[in-house]
Structure formats: structure tokens, C-alpha cells
């Protein structure tokens, strides 16, 4: 059982040609205000008076414990409300032939995300991670991401949830052909047989031939390599 467990972990050491993923922690130099205005989503909005902070952040725990707070006892008797986060950023190694994403591990709750004034979408609730493709909206310099967080409808939880971007955020850069988000899945049977499923996403305008290489290394240094080539149409995933 011990050998099988180690083998399973080592099976994750796979590489995919032209699929490099550069995921950078994106938590420093955010700005925050516990107020609300639709203008706060605009690229050129004046946020110079906002509070500067590092994520993760929970504005609720910074408030006062009051019996009159609508969150009630289950919410810690702490305030909710609506808050905004903004971050100015550059992409120093920006390239037009790359893909760019922003990943949120968790925002509580009802978050709406904007990049350079463009609304990307709204994520209800607050416990799931989510991603937006920002490739067509970003440039090398002078980018702004804005996040509206609405936890004003109280009470909404059976326990203390907090408010805000309470988990990490990542800026992700990939090739146009890359392993899909959450695109690797490894399973093993009782007798030690292993199955590795890899999803590949093609964002190019052409049909490409790709090679997926999976390597399994045992305790004796023996390597078993399996390679397969497939054609992948543009805009598709396998």
C-alpha cells in the first residue's frame, strides 16, 4: 500500500509540450473601501483615498460585535455590507500570443469582477473557487481589476462566514495550447493499475498535433513513459 501511494503521487510529475502554466500569487497592493458606487468599476476611478492591504482580507471581523447586527448570533453578530477592492497592475512579460486568467480561491459573497472597466461576471455565494479569462482585456501596463463584494443580505449562513476576498488570488499565464484548468485527474485501482486523464485546451486558430507525456517513477528509479499524439481542432478541448 505504501508503494502504491508513492507511485500515485509520482504519477503527477507529468509534462505537456507547449503547456507551461505560470501562476503568480496576486495578493499584494490591493485597495479597499466599505462603500458602494457603480463608478468604482471604472478604469480611471480615483481610488487614492482607499485603504491599502494584502489579501486575504475579511472586513467583517474588523467590525464591532453588536447584537443589532443583522447577521445574528450564527454570523458572529458582526457587520456585513458591500465592499469594493481594486488593484493596479502591469504584466511585465506580456505577450500577445499568451493567455491570461485571474483565479479566485474564494470571495464571500456575490462578487462581481471587472478588468479595465469590463464586467467579467458575477459569482454567487462564496465558498467555491472561480476563474475568468482576461486575455482580451489586459495589456502590458496600466491594468486595473475591481471586485464588488455584496454580503448585505443577512443572515445568510449557519456559521460565521466573514466578508470579502478571504482566500488567495492568482494571475495565471499560459500558452494558447495548455492543460485545461483542473485538467489532470489520476485514479488507481486496488491492484495498482493507474489511469491518468489529461484535458488539453487549444485556443489557437489552427488544428495542431500535440504530444502528452506522462511519467511514472518507482522507488528504484525505473521510469515508465507513455506518449500519445492527437490532432486537436482550434477552440476545442480533449
Each language-model region and where it sits:
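Bacterial N-terminal signal peptides that target proteins for export
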Residues: 1-7
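Accessory beta-strand-rich segments of carbohydrate-active enzymes
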Residues: 24-26, 32-36, 80-185, 203-204, ...
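Short, solvent-exposed loop/linker segments at the N-terminal edge
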Residues: 186-192
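Short, surface-exposed linear segments at secondary-structure transitions and domain or protein termini
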Residues: 35, 52, 132, 233-238
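Bacterial N-terminal signal peptides
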Residues: 8-15
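Short, P/G- and charge-enriched loop/turn segments at secondary-structure junctions
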Residues: 71-77, 185
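Beta-strand-rich binding/interaction modules
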Residues: 115, 193-232, 237-238
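Accessory carbohydrate-binding/adhesion or oligomerization-edge regions at the termini
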Residues: 20-71, 144-148, 152
Amino acid at each position: 500500500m505504501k508503494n502504491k501511494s508513492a507511485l500515485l503521487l509520482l504519477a503527477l510529475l507529468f509534462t505537456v509540450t507547449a503547456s507551461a502554466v505560470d501562476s503568480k500569487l496576486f495578493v499584494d497592493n490591493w485597495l479597499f473601501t466599505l462603500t458602494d458606487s457603480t463608478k468604482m468599476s471604472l478604469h480611471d476611478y480615483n481610488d487614492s483615498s482607499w485603504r491599502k492591504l494584502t489579501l486575504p482580507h475579511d472586513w467583517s471581523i474588523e467590525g464591532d460585535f453588536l447584537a443589532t447586527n443583522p447577521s445574528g448570533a450564527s454570523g458572529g453578530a458582526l457587520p456585513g455590507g458591500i465592499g469594493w477592492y481594486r488593484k493596479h497592475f502591469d504584466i511585465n512579460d506580456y505577450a500577445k500570443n499568451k493567455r491570461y486568467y485571474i483565479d479566485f480561491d474564494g470571495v464571500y459573497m456575490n462578487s462581481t469582477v471587472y478588468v479595465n472597466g469590463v464586467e467579467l461576471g458575477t459569482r454567487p455565494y462564496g465558498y467555491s473557487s472561480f476563474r475568468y479569462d482576461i486575455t482580451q482585456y489586459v495589456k502590458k501596463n496600466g491594468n486595473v481589476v475591481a471586485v464588488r463584494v455584496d454580503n448585505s443580505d443577512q443572515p445568510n449562513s449557519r456559521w460565521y462566514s466573514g466578508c470579502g476576498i478571504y482566500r488567495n488570488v492568482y494571475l495565471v499565464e499560459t500558452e494558447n495550447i495548455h492543460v485545461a484548468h483542473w485538467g489532470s485527474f489520476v485514479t488507481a485501482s486496488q491492484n495498482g493499475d493507474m489511469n491518468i486523464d489529461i484535458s488539453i485546451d487549444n485556443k489557437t486558430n489552427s488544428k495542431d498535433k500535440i504530444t502528452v507525456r506522462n511519467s511514472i517513477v518507482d522507488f528504484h528509479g525505473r521510469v515508465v513513459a507513455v506518449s500519445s499524439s492527437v490532432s486537436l481542432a482550434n477552440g476545442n478541448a480533449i
